[in-house]
Every structure is written in structure tokens, then in C-alpha cells.
């Protein structure tokens, strides 16, 4: 019981020290940019499409160990990720148009 109390006091002291240095605890976390996250999501969509295309080419060339059900599953995953990306883009465009039509 006493240990938990001491840990609480220590964390409060650390928070006070951070405030004294004019930096908050939230400032120590890395910043995540919207553009970076969007770029990463587009890269993941591209990667799934490339992987599905490669898998389909391997199956077409008759490489051993490549099953039709795996190829179809990868192609569907690729299609679903692309459709999700398109829907996100549509929502972003709609939000942008709505913001632009607002009066200041």
C-alpha cells in the first residue's frame, strides 16, 4: 500500500518538473501528422495490390506452392482495401467541399 502511494507522489513530482521546464507531458509524445498517416495508408493499399498481383502471376506461371484459393483471397483483400481507400477519399472530398462552402 505504501509503495503505491510513493509511486503516485513520484509521478506527480515528475509532472510538476515537466511543467516547470515549460513542456507538458503531452509534448513528449511524437507528433503524428495527418498527411503522414494518409501517405502510409496509401502505401499499405499499394503494397496489398502489388502482393496480390505478384501472387496471381506466380499462380499463372504454375509455380509450386501457390494455391488458387490463396490467390483469390489476396485479390479480394486488395479489392476491399482499394474500395476502403476510395470511400475515405470520397469522405475527405465531401468534408473539404463542406468546409469551403461555410461562410466566414
Swiss-Prot record:
Pfam families named among the record's database cross-references? FliE
**What keyword terms does UniProt attach to this protein?**
Bacterial flagellum
What InterPro entries does this protein map onto?
FliE
Picking any one GO biological process from the record gives: bacterial-type flagellum-dependent cell motility
Compartment(s) where it occurs, according to its Swiss-Prot or TrEMBL record: Bacterial flagellum basal body
Q: Which GO terms describe its molecular function?
A: cytoskeletal motor activity; structural molecule activity
Q: Which domain of life is it from?
A: Bacteria
Q: Name one GO cellular component term.
A: bacterial-type flagellum basal body
Q: Where is the signal peptide?
A: none
For this UniProt entry, what is the primary localization, expressed as one broad class? other
Q: Member of which family?
A: Belongs to the FliE family.
HAMAP family documented for this protein: FliE
Question: What name does UniProt use for this protein?
Answer: Flagellar hook-basal body complex protein FliE
Per the UniProt record, the source organism is Enterobacter sp. (strain 638)
Gene that this polypeptide is encoded by: fliE
